[in-house]
Amino acid sequence: MSTELVEDEAQFYCKAQKYWKNVPATVDGMLGGYGHISNIDLNGSKKFLQRFLRQEGSNKTGNMYALDCGAGIGRITKRLLLPLFKKVDMVDVTDEFLSKAKSYLGEEGSRVGNYFCCGLQEFSPEPNRYDVIWIQWVIGHLTDEHLVDFLKRCSLGLRPNGIIVIKDNVTQDVSIMDDVDSSICRDIDLVRKLIKQAGLSLLAVERQENFPDEIYHVFSFAMR
């Protein structure tokens, strides 16, 4: 379990919060200096998501409302979710990022319903509200127990045929703690195990292509 890497839970969360307080409210800041990969990332995400939005028949995922978790300034909200959904809610632990989002999103930001300033370990989506809950590059800031609990709460937040998507760095063997931003990069088998513990079933798993060789492999997991 990766939580064994967390010696002091309160410190784990506090250190991460302090780290993000000092990160510039820019796309490059959101991506740790890798702003140049944003388009590749968003194109891969759109392709992954549209397989569910374009499904034929009764299993098709709706396009009414999405939730962006760990939303930052709204990079994903602006370029992925607002073009595909009628409304979007954003949740992030850093108030300065959400404040910046209101100008960064421009006119389309009028379709953002709520800006929730909250850590995901304390956040509960409104039941039966969202067609898609998008969780990208943020699960490393949750302990295993809090991640499982959060996914359970997300499951309750889904509308019929809704899906949860996790997109994040994974390792192939052991989980690794990053002491700089106080986050855990989990091994892919552990991510699958925690999803199962939350009572969710995987619908699709896909590796993001065309990312720089020096960064961790990034996988998308769709579930409900």
Swiss-Prot record:
Q: Does the keyword DNA-binding apply?
A: no
Q: What does this protein do?
A: Distributive alpha-N-methyltransferase that methylates the N-terminus of target proteins containing the N-terminal motif [Ala/Gly/Pro/Ser]-Pro-Lys when the initiator Met is cleaved. Specifically catalyzes mono-, di- or tri-methylation of the exposed alpha-amino group of the Ala, Gly or Ser residue in the [Ala/Gly/Ser]-Pro-Lys motif and mono- or di-methylation of Pro in the Pro-Pro-Lys motif. Required during mitosis for normal bipolar spindle formation and chromosome segregation via its action on target proteins.
Keywords assigned by UniProt, alphabetized: Methyltransferase, Nucleus, S-adenosyl-L-methionine, Transferase
Could you state a single Gene Ontology molecular function term?
Answer: protein methyltransferase activity
Protein name, per record: N-terminal Xaa-Pro-Lys N-methyltransferase 1
Binding positions (S-adenosyl-L-methionine): 70, 75, 92-94, 120-121, 136
Catalyzes what? N-terminal L-alanyl-L-prolyl-L-lysyl-[protein] + 3 S-adenosyl-L-methionine = N-terminal N,N,N-trimethyl-L-alanyl-L-prolyl-L-lysyl-[protein] + 3 S-adenosyl-L-homocysteine + 3 H(+); N-terminal L-seryl-L-prolyl-L-lysyl-[protein] + 3 S-adenosyl-L-methionine = N-terminal N,N,N-trimethyl-L-seryl-L-prolyl-L-lysyl-[protein] + 3 S-adenosyl-L-homocysteine + 3 H(+); N-terminal L-prolyl-L-prolyl-L-lysyl-[protein] + 2 S-adenosyl-L-methionine = N-terminal N,N-dimethyl-L-prolyl-L-prolyl-L-lysyl-[protein] + 2 S-adenosyl-L-homocysteine + 2 H(+)
Q: Name one GO cellular component term.
A: nucleus
Taken from the record, one Pfam family name reads Methyltransf_PK
Q: Which domain of life is it from?
A: Eukaryota
Query: What Enzyme Commission number(s) does the record list for this chain?
Result: 2.1.1.244
Give the UniProt subcellular location, in the record's own words. Answer: Nucleus
